[in-house]
Amino acid sequence: LAELVLREDKDGWTVLTLNRPEKLNSLTVSLFKELRQHIIDLRDDDAVRCVVLRGAGKCFSAGHDLGDIAEGEDVPSAGWHSETLRLMEKLPKPVIAAVHGHCYTGALEVALAADFIVAADTARFGDTHAKWALTPVWGMSQRLPRRVGIATAKRLMFTADMIDANEAVRIGLAEYAVPLDQFDAEIEGLVARIIANSPFSNAANKQLLEATDMRPMDAGLQWEVMETAGIGPDMAERIAAFTKK
């Protein structure tokens, strides 16, 4: 059987590819099981300093497989999908969702669990839960308003509107958009800039930002000082290399 999530290790980073292109990478329990195992494997893999999540073929993912829903999925436990995405969100390294083509509903919930989204100009985003008389259980109600604001989240959820890459950038859902023919090169360049920096700092800063998100300013400032991860083991080497230039 074909792998439903491919792992490709590069020089200091890894690409995870949703791999059901004949089904527009629609999301099943089996696919999520493979994604979850990759996430667990990556958590303690110090050779990997950045992770890119993308889709094979025409799109990132058309969303949760409606056939699976209709047949009654055999989910390992209540909240298991959400827990899987939380594991990805808490990986101690940057995670980028590289989105081209469709990114709807469950797929958008997956992309929102990355640290940020970069879009190809072909990307289309939407939340269609309301179209199918469903409500989100993979994190949409929490991550979407944190990303775009509660009013915009309500508009997208109430209307089930599809938005293009430019609109996604305008509302803050995606960081920026690039032409599809430049997409791979852009992602590689972005990753290169990330992994050139200290993996210690990237992990510590990710944890700091998450721990203090939505805290009152004074509480956040206190946390930054009192809970600091301190100085990384590569600090002296990095400063010495810079001063020798």
What are these regions (language model features)?
Residues 11, 66, 81, 141, ...:
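A general structural signal for well-ordered alpha-helical segments in protein cores
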Residues 30, 34, 80, 87, ...:
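Charged catalytic carboxylate motif
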Residues 40, 55-90, 103, 133, ...:
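Glycine- (often His-adjacent) and acidic-residue-rich active-site loop
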Residues 1-11, 160-166, 181, 185, ...:
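C-terminal alpha-helix plus adjacent terminal tail
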Residues 1-56:
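Conserved CoA-thioester-binding segment of acyl-CoA-metabolizing enzymes
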Residues 16, 20, 35, 53, ...:
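Terminal peptide-recognition signature
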Residues 86-200:
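Crotonase-fold acyl-CoA enzyme core
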